[in-house]
Amino acid sequence: MNSKEIRKAWLDFFESKNHFIVPPKSLIPVNDNSLLWINSGVATLKDYFSGKKNPPSKRMANSQKSIRTNDIENVGITARHHTFFEMLGNFSIGGYFKKEAIEFATEFVLDVLKLDRSRLYFTYFHDDLETKNLWISQGFKEEQLIPGDRKTNFWEVGKGPCGPNTEIFYDRGEKYDQRGIELLKNDIENDRYIEIWNIVFSTYNSDGEGNYTELNQKNIDTGAGLERIVSILQDAPTNFDTDLFLPIIHEIEKYTSYRYKIENYFIKDKAQKEINSYFKIIADHMRTVVNAIADGEKPSNLSRGYILRRLIRRSYYKAIQLKITKSPFLYKLVDVIKASLPFEYDSKKVAEVIKEEEVLFSQTISKGKEILEKFISENSSKDLFPGDLAYKLHETYGFPFELTEEILLQKDIKINKEEFNLAKEKHIEASRNQKETGMDKVINSLALIKAKEDEFIGYEHTNSVSKILHLLNEENELSENDGTSYLILDKTPFYATSGGQKHDRGYIEQNGVKLEILNVFKDKFGNHVHKVVGKLSKNYPVTCQVDLKIRRGLERNHSGTHLMFCALRNVFGNQIKQLGSDNNEDRLTFDAPFDSKPTNEEILKVENLVKSYIQKEVDRQYLIMGIDQAKEINAIMTLEEAEYMDSSKLRIVNFNGITADLCGGTHLENTKLLEDFKITSVEKKAAGVYRIRAISSKETIEKYLENQKQELMQELLVLVKKLKDMQFDFKVSLDESLELSSQIQEIKNLTNLASEAIKNKIKENSKKISIDLNEIELENINGNYLYLNDEISKEEIKNLSGVIREKFPNALVILISKGEAQSAISFASKKYNSINVLKELANHFELRGGGNAILAMGSIKDYSQLKTFLKEKYKWEN
């Protein structure tokens, strides 16, 4: 049986036993802060077992995708460690118990999987003789039953439900280990007796102090590893040698001269074992990365995003060890991974995220090599590399420790391991004491802060003169600094990233020098920490000024989120819950559960409702009240009540007569200031969860519609060309020929009309521009053509970008409209991906913006070195 057949067989079997089949849920937990990832089949059903929610049935079964990264170093080394896996489960909540669970298990392994009865073994808790006798009643011999102790066969985690468990093992034979049943009896790790199914009998309630009372409602919780079952049925030495992994491994082989050899499990060639491990690590890690990104997570320096970044970078390094020189490369594995699993998502979007992360890491590799080469050239007589610098390379730059070691060994230089471990321990200790939301990296010096000291005044004020209470770099508190600093002020108007709203931007000024606010986040006490770069002294006050345009954008989209949430509940019912939101100055996203994807008609209803709220011109109120009062006015509790330190002083954002929401963000004074509202997309984020993206304000929506129009025109041009090139060369019967001929002629007529309309539109746009297209000269940079003009008016920059792009489709067109503090800039091309160009240059210049493949627009502070960079350092990629 292949993996797809086994998964289907499990679900079909339990459906035939009247189990409700629970669809696989997102890897990202919903309203469960105790989990970083969904890590088991039962993790998505916790609310049913706790009684918080009513289950759809007393009997349930699933095949749940899961992530565990606590044993990442074992992946690729052992036969069965994975970061991503599927857990098959069957569950009973107050329904059947031991007898039925054991009968179902017996029937499935013998009649469905067709496993050899004589090769099955079962462990059970030594006091649980009922379970032992139930296995015997199924025809198994006593010598196939192994008693276990509390450590091996009693499931208990602190207080709460607990009970004995029984495990099913399969003996794969002497070729995997000549030692016999003693392996299982003594709980020795081995590759012969493989656990395939664990059945937990939730029987008692523990008080955590060794006292147990029997539960009124007894439950069954089981887990069977799909990868393990597949390896047994396919007689594969390891899980990696099955149809779940081999297609991915074979795809990797296309890019390297090295080969993965299954037979090496038995031959045990040391060099080949190492090579095999590289293939396994890449295949495993990229399964995790692809599925996590598909469920809505993205690589970053925080939380789940940090894990994805680490897995991608670890895979990237293993690709280097396989001498894979084509970079980026990992993103090319997305399609084969998707084909091996039953989950639906946009593989192109997932690949784009991975590719972007690979490009970013390739720059990190270059930076790390520069630092190492500099040390080697300046310290040619030294044979020991500072361990703290090696750790900084790893932690700050993400440069793999193994690569540092490899490069240095070529020069007979060793790393001071003692210093490395000390630096690592120091970092871990600081991380343990910090849980700041919105932090872009670990800042050890924040451990020096011991209490809440600041005051947020940003609801009432957007500027202030403030005193610096703490001036920090990453390690220490300072009296002055010239570089990256983290400030805590006595009072601040800057909102910190929280509640789905991005932080304020703006500047602080000291002694006539303005420093841009790069980030604002809260430490564990709730102090606002401001990140800036430049010269500062703790001895002088600072003038704070919030960027009012960005603040207004944030307010629009946060208020727009509340109004859209209200509209969604009006259209779909009060069962709609907010599962997540993200608001910045440009757009908003909102995650909510739906039975099926909302239709265009339903989305239009939501959009029109929000527009009606705008037209009502309703004032916003901030109300402070207790939780009971909040419930009386039907305030929507979009945040967990427990997150509020004082439930008697909840902050309610009230648009009277429309919606009242528990919220700590900044909002518009009146709904009319939203101006306009448009939902731009609805996409599936996970099973039963959809992400809605929307924008607000007339200017933003006009820009969006213009971009859409430009894209549509390009699509039409391509379609026209394709239709004109079509050869209608086929035979038809006489009766059909007249009708077909008429239809073909109609298509041709419409094509010609569309073609003329597009040409006229381009001609019309061309008349509006202020330069002569025939006088444009392209610059040749190593076979790549560039047109850069910084004397364009802001009003015509967008129109002109499109016209020049059509005239010179193989060139990169960069137009700039000069400004005092910053300049407007556009990138347009049919050959080069415009938004990727913008993103790449943003890594080297103070540049921000957005767009699409054929047109991207933004703003840039200093572009004086832009052309030089494009000539000397930029990697031109189609």
From Swiss-Prot:
EC numbers for this chain = 6.1.1.7
Class of the enzyme per the UniProt entry, highest EC level: ligase
Q: Does the keyword ATP-binding apply?
A: yes
GO cellular component entries? cytosol
GO MF: alanine-tRNA ligase activity; aminoacyl-tRNA deacylase activity; ATP binding; tRNA binding; zinc ion binding
The source's domain of life comes to Bacteria
Listed transmembrane segments: none
Assigned protein family: Belongs to the class-II aminoacyl-tRNA synthetase family.
Q: What is this protein called?
A: Alanine--tRNA ligase
The coding gene here is: alaS
